[in-house]
A protein has these predicted regions:
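Short catalytic/signature loops enriched in Gly
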Residues: 2-5, 23-37, 50-56, 61, ...
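Conserved ABC ATPase "signature" region
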Residues: 40, 111-112, 163-180, 289-290
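The feature captures the beta-strand-to-loop junction immediately N-terminal to the Walker
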Residues: 81-82
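Helix-to-loop junction immediately C-terminal to a conserved catalytic motif
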Residues: 96
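Conserved ABC transporter NBD signature motif
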Residues: 104-112, 124
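Conserved ABC ATPase signature
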Residues: 185-189, 193
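P-loop NTP-binding/switch modules centered on Walker-like glycine-rich loops
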Residues: 208-211, 215-219, 223-301
């Protein structure tokens, strides 16, 4: 279901005292031209220290985000997917500066905002907003909807044309809510309506970048499509740039232009939507895609190869050496255990951090691995490997049997000896 554009959405927005002539809520009032880099992240890290003892000395760290690089262009939507605990939400809070990074750089419109203080970030809060995951805890239950949605105007000392109340009612109508509900409280709304209120609050100051952290995960399936379509409509109408964090691959496919796949604090693949879903190159991405249910019984029976990953996700406190996915990867070799693969563009618009990528026939750069040799090995060696494995298993089984038999004979002799000495 697509949410129709509201008539109020086309009205000229409010102006601010600080910047006359800037429209709040007007269409396409962005400084960055479409296609220009709006957000650039380089080597971003966030390590949460682990402290123990009376003196609270640091004994380790949780490597939630451990060196990621990506760019977001004006007007596009970047989707970020991965398992729970991979660092998606932490990354979202880092680029909105709700968390202080451990290392790395965050640039917004070419300006380094990595270490700006509260005062330095205040003007940028108008341009960078966040939609939080839980609509039940992100709204203050003691405040009315008018107070919640109007808070950004008061915090930024912005006076909309016609007053705050009129602008808040316009925003409520834009997100598909009744403007007359201005004086109601959050508990009087459903989960989907509360998320719409959160979206209205994020759009209040006409931001350039909106980071949406699992915007539909807490909602019923029947409501998810409405909220997703609303975000899409608002992007078309207002020229917004999104970073959408989610674990639902269907949602990400519907709204994203490019998709980043995260695993254990790292981006393992970054590609255009069509390329990623048609031919994923990282084994982890391929495993994620195989878990997406296919609603067509005929296609489901024809494409029923579900990849079940072995083991659990390693702890971010002590991640594996080399490629972090090698402990669960069916293609892992020695180079995967010792050398961390860089995120390289192996196809136009498709970057992957893997020594043995999927759906890739050409030779990879020499600093990773010779993929032509890996491909030949994959086609020619399996029988020999299986035979060698079988021989090894048989030899090991024979050795264990001999040791067991010798141990049993020794135990029997000891029992006989004890029995004889007891008779004497």
């Amino acid at each position: 279901m697509s949410i129709p554009a509201q008539a109020d959405g086309a009205e000229p927005g409010a102006t601010t005292g600080a910047t006359a002539g800037e429209a709040v809520g007007a269409t396409l009032t962005k400084d960055a031209a479409p296609g220009e880099i709006l957000l650039k992240v380089t080597g971003l890290q966030k390590h949460f220290p682990i402290r123990k003892g009376l003196l609270q000395r640091q004994t380790g760290a949780v490597r939630a985000v451990d060196g990621i690089d990506f760019e977001v262009r004006a007007g596009e939507t970047l989707g970020v997917v991965g398992e729970s605990g991979c660092g998606k939400s932490t990354m979202g809070r880092l680029i909105t500066r709700l968390l202080e990074p451990t290392a790395g750089k965050v640039e917004f419109e070419g300006k380094d905002i990595t270490h700006l203080g509260v005062g330095g970030m205040r003007p940028l809060r108008r341009d960078v907003q966040m939609i939080f995951q839980d609509p039940y805890s992100s709204l203050n239950p003691r405040h009315t909807i008018g107070t919640i949605v109007g808070a950004p105007f008061r915090l930024q000392k912005v006076t909309p044309e016609g007053g705050i109340k009129k602008e808040v009612q316009r925003l409520l109508s834009v997100v598909g809510l009744n403007p007359e509900h201005y004086n109601r409280y959050p508990h009087e709304f459903s989960g989907g309506q509360r998320q719409r209120i959160g979206i209205a609050r994020a759009l209040a100051l006409n931001p350039k970048l909106v980071v949406a952290d699992e915007p539909v995960s807490a909602l019923d399936v029947s409501i998810q499509a409405q909220v997703v379509n609303l975000l899409d409509d608002l992007q078309q109408e207002l020229g917004l740039t999104y970073v959408i964090i989610a674990h639902d691959l269907s949602v990400v496919r519907h709204v994203s232009d490019r998709i980043a796949v995260m695993y254990l604090g790292k981006i393992v693949e970054l590609a255009d939507r069509e390329a990623l879903y048609k031919a994923p190159m990282h084994p982890y991405t391929k495993a994620l895609m195989s878990a997406v249910p296919i609603p067509d019984p005929k296609r489901r029976s024809a494409k029923s190869e579900r990849i079940l990953l072995r083991g659990d996700v390693p702890s971010p406190i002590s991640p594996p050496s080399g490629c972090r996915f090698h402990t669960r990867c069916w293609k892992a070799t020695e180079i995967c255990r010792t050398t961390e693969p860089p995120l390289l563009e192996l196809k136009p618009g498709q970057r992957v951090a893997c020594h043995h990528p999927e759906n890739f026939e050409d030779q990879a750069p020499q600093d990773t691995v010779l993929l032509s040799a890996a491909k030949d090995a994959g086609e020619l060696v399996p029988d020999a490997v299986l035979a060698e494995s079988a021989e090894t298993s048989e030899a090991l089984a024979a050795e264990v049997a001999e040791q067991t038999e010798a141990a049993e004979e020794g135990a029997e002799a000891e029992r006989v000896e004890k029995s004889d000495s007891g008779d004497k």
